[in-house]
């Protein structure tokens, strides 16, 4: 698998400064999710990776919910940049 094929939305300078920002964390989780998804397409019975994927999806969802409550503009921009579907909010 090619690691460089993943998206680079956040410029390199910002990555060095802002590793704790919500946007960077969501970006990082999204790359991990895409990597695990492609892995699971080849290895359908890798249940530990499936569990890890579900945990990462939950973490990303909680961060996105937090960002939605705090700053809707940044949320919409991030969703658009990362090409993530907007979840149903209960």
UniProtKB/Swiss-Prot annotation:
Alphabetized Pfam families for the sequence: Ribosomal_S15
UniProt keyword annotation of rRNA processing present: no
Source organism (scientific name): Dioscorea elephantipes
Localization per Swiss-Prot or TrEMBL: Plastid, Chloroplast
Protein name in the entry: Small ribosomal subunit protein uS15c
GO BP: any one term: translation
Domain of life: Eukaryota
Oligomer status and interactors: Part of the 30S ribosomal subunit.
Family per similarity comment: Belongs to the universal ribosomal protein uS15 family.
HAMAP family: Ribosomal_uS15_B
Gene name of the record: rps15
Lineage: Eukaryota, Viridiplantae, Streptophyta, Embryophyta, Tracheophyta
MF (Gene Ontology): structural constituent of ribosome
NCBIfam families linked: S15_bact (TIGR00952)
Gene3D superfamilies named among the record's database cross-references: S15/NS1, RNA-binding
TM annotation in the entry: none
UniProt GO cellular component terms: chloroplast; ribonucleoprotein complex; ribosome
Keywords from the named record: Chloroplast, Plastid, Ribonucleoprotein, Ribosomal protein
